[in-house]
Amino acid sequence: MSDVKVAFLTDSCSDIPQELADKYGIDVIGFHIMLDGKEYLERKDMTNDQFYEMMRQSKSVPTTAAITQLEWVDIYAKYVDAGIQNLVHLCINAGGSSTYNNAVKAAELLEDERPGHKMKIHLIDSHTYSMPYGWYLCECARKVCAGEPLDACLREMQDKLARVEICLAAYSLKQMKKSGRVSAAAAVVGDLMGIRPIISLNDGISKVEAKVRGDNNVPPAMVKWVKSRVDDVKKMPYMVAYTSSTAKRDELVKLCKKEFGHAPLLVFQLGGVVSANTGPDGIAIVFEGKPRRLVDYAVPLP
């Protein structure tokens, strides 16, 4: 590795397992989550499983608050004081949270806190949620630490982010009803009939791709949709995500191995930011599809 000091930073929506964050030296800053009049800092005040149980018991809708400008300024200043020369900061989709824009402003305000600082901030909008950007940040950190050029690793990461897709299934519509994403009537009828939506989440935009009846039909429908998005699933990198049900997780992993011909890169648990909208009962497949958008490569700040 070169003598240039590099640090890696992201937010808790990335859902990076703590063991991977520790392994690759990635700092993960928690989102603020409000539920039943109380504020919790994700990754510090509760575990994912505790949050899921709180959602089930609550009649209110959990809300999330963006990481603020002042929080980012304080964090950036600590990196400057530590002698960091390049800070790689990968953020939650800018279209779904003000966290990215707050970080942009913080990079400007940093000059007031640390006049004349020389740290380059590589601030990147992931255009997605959860481990799709968490995984690629881990890969970027791993390669940089192994001595690969930072600029090349950053370009590769952004290229892959333009290909990554999420296929999500919710086993209950209760949380979507609470959050207003579906009407109360539709949620009641849907749950009574056992309707399970298969949802794509690409570039921050969610879309119902299919509706199936019954839990047993969920994994096959997800796999079918994923197959429609790629040319060769045998060469497709993918991950499996879950909320609280290990049984549904294991069922999906088993089917993916059979249909895709290889095991997932990682099986991970979804955190509070995503599940605050989808509910505590869901599974997902994260995979590399075809390029969907041109990449506007980030320019270091300031």
Residue ranges of model-derived segments:
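Generic alpha-helical hydrophobic packing signal
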Residues: 7, 73, 77, 117-119
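Glycine/charged-rich beta-loop-alpha catalytic/anionic-binding loops adjacent to active sites
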Residues: 57, 84-89, 113-124, 267
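N-terminal glycine-rich anion-binding loop in soluble enzyme alpha/beta folds
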Residues: 6-73
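N-terminal glycine-rich phosphate/adenylate-binding segment common to multiple enzyme folds
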Residues: 69-103, 107-110
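Mixed-charge interfacial surface used for oligomerization/domain docking
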Residues: 2-7, 13-27, 32, 95-108, ...
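Short N-terminal secondary-structure initiator segments
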Residues: 57-72, 84, 135-153
